Swiss-Prot record:
Residues noted as binding a ubiquinone in the record, renumbered to the chain: H201
Name assigned to this protein: Cytochrome b
Main location: mitochondrion
Primary gene name: MT-CYB
Binding site for heme b b562: H83, H182
Similarity comment: Belongs to the cytochrome b family.
One BP annotation, GO: mitochondrial electron transport, ubiquinol to cytochrome c
Cofactor note: Binds 2 heme b groups non-covalently.
Keyword Electron transport: yes
Keywords: Electron transport, Heme, Iron, Membrane, Metal-binding, Mitochondrion, Mitochondrion inner membrane, Respiratory chain, Transmembrane, Transmembrane helix, Transport, Ubiquinone
Assembly and interaction partners: The cytochrome bc1 complex contains 11 subunits: 3 respiratory subunits (MT-CYB, CYC1 and UQCRFS1), 2 core proteins (UQCRC1 and UQCRC2) and 6 low-molecular weight proteins (UQCRH/QCR6, UQCRB/QCR7, UQCRQ/QCR8, UQCR10/QCR9, UQCR11/QCR10 and a cleavage product of UQCRFS1). This cytochrome bc1 complex then forms a dimer.
Note, other: Heme 1 (or BL or b562) is low-potential and absorbs at about 562 nm, and heme 2 (or BH or b566) is high-potential and absorbs at about 566 nm.
Annotated TM spans: 33-53, 77-98, 113-133, 178-198, 226-246, 288-308, 320-340, 347-367
Length: 379
């Protein structure tokens, strides 16, 4: 009799990826976020599918179709708020997952890391387009402001913006295409996730010590499946608490006002998970400079494998680098706060200082500190 999990072409892949996968024996809860992100993606696709059944991508009916989902569709309010807050959970886990990668030096798996950065861009694009769909005030003006940034690209900029809009302003054509892209991108993301895992399973997982763990592996199932279930439990408790008690906590009240091209909201700002990048964009008084800083604030992640100058992989045994890491986290929290504030004194100055500190820490302080630690250890 053949052993199906090990011989069947499809089941064999699943078996090697989630059951018999050799995993380091010492990976902590920081390694839970991969599975949580996978669950978030599945949840978003599922809730999104049910929302798409009732949503209409037309400027005249989009806003009222969302209202209809919340009021008239069975458990429509639940599906809508699970989708909206699920996106917030998605980004929380993404940022923690990336932070873990930086702290423990997981970026030395360059293929896995670079696909991860592309995934981040894809998820950010999807979330941005999803925010436009309810066609509230912040949807409309957010779409106008962010797409308009592309006009800063020399020579082709203005033409490119009109091409994306499908006209001379954000209108019906824009909404329709954003819905189409918002629907297709999660499936592209799913394919990219598979590539991300394929590259990861070529090398095996990193671990908190940063030392090769080939000599000490345990099967993924049951050890890490049960550990993942605990993470999933915590995630669902947090998500459902948000959805049931404060569904609008992370949203913008302006988005409950239907889109009006003749009335600009006093403070145009994106969802909370983009505020750090928005603060960096706003801190540069030049349009093209701001756009470049915005893009580079994410693209800088691809430089981590190049900038790694320590003889140790992980930060576990490097106290000075740990201080810088937490300084970077604090800096990003300050940027997030500034991104939600109006453009006036003292927020402008704080934003500019935090933006400079962000790039300075990653590009200069972290690599030079790592070199100093090598010297201190006589390496």
């Amino acid at each position: 009799m053949t052993n199906t999990p090990k011989s069947h072409p499809l089941i064999k892949i699943m078996n090697h990826s989630f059951i018999d996968l050799p995993a380091p024996s010492n990976i902590s809860a920081w390694w839970n976020f991969g599975s949580l992100l996978g669950l978030c993606l599945g949840l978003q696709i599922l809730t999104g599918l049910f929302l798409a059944m009732h949503y209409t991508a037309d400027t005249t009916t989009a806003f009222s179709s969302v209202t209809h989902i919340c009021r008239d569709v069975n458990y429509g309010w639940l599906i809508r708020y699970m989708h909206a807050n699920g996106a917030s959970m998605f980004f929380i886990f993404l940022y923690l997952h990336i932070g873990r990668g930086i702290y423990y030096g997981s970026y030395t798996f360059t293929n896995t890391w670079n696909i991860g950065v592309l995934l981040l861009f894809a998820v950010m694009a999807t979330a941005f387009m999803g925010y436009v769909l309810p066609w509230g005030q912040m949807s409309f003006w957010g779409a106008t402001v962010i797409t308009n940034l592309l006009s800063a690209i020399p020579y082709i900029g203005p033409t490119l913006v009109e091409w994306i809009w499908g006209g001379f302003s954000v209108d019906k054509a824009t909404l329709t295409r954003f819905f189409a892209f918002h629907f297709i991108l999660p499936f592209i993301i799913t394919a990219m996730v598979m590539i991300h895992l394929l590259f990861l399973h070529e090398t095996g997982s990193n671990n908190p010590s940063g030392v090769n763990s080939d000599s000490d592996k345990i099967p993924f199932h049951p050890y890490y499946t049960i550990k993942d279930v605990l993470g999933i439990l915590f995630m669902m408790i947090t998500l459902m608490s948000l959805v049931m008690f404060t569904p609008d906590l992370l949203g913008d009240p302006d988005n409950y006002t239907p889109a009006n091209p003749l009335n600009t909201p006093p403070h145009i700002k994106p969802e909370w998970y983009f505020l750090f990048a928005y603060a960096i964009l706003r801190s540069i008084p030049n349009k093209l400079g701001g756009v470049l800083a915005l893009v580079f604030s994410i693209l800088i992640l691809t430089l981590f494998p190049i900038l790694h100058s320590s003889k140790q992989r992980s930060m576990s045994f490097r106290p000075l680098s740990q201080c810088l890491m937490w300084m970077l986290v604090a800096n990003l929290l300050i940027l997030t706060w500034i991104g939600g504030q109006p453009v006036e004194h003292p927020f402008i100055t704080i934003g500019q200082l935090a933006s400079v500190t962000y790039f300075f820490t990653i590009l200069i302080l972290m690599p030079s500190t790592a070199l100093m630690e090598n010297k201190l250890l006589k390496w």
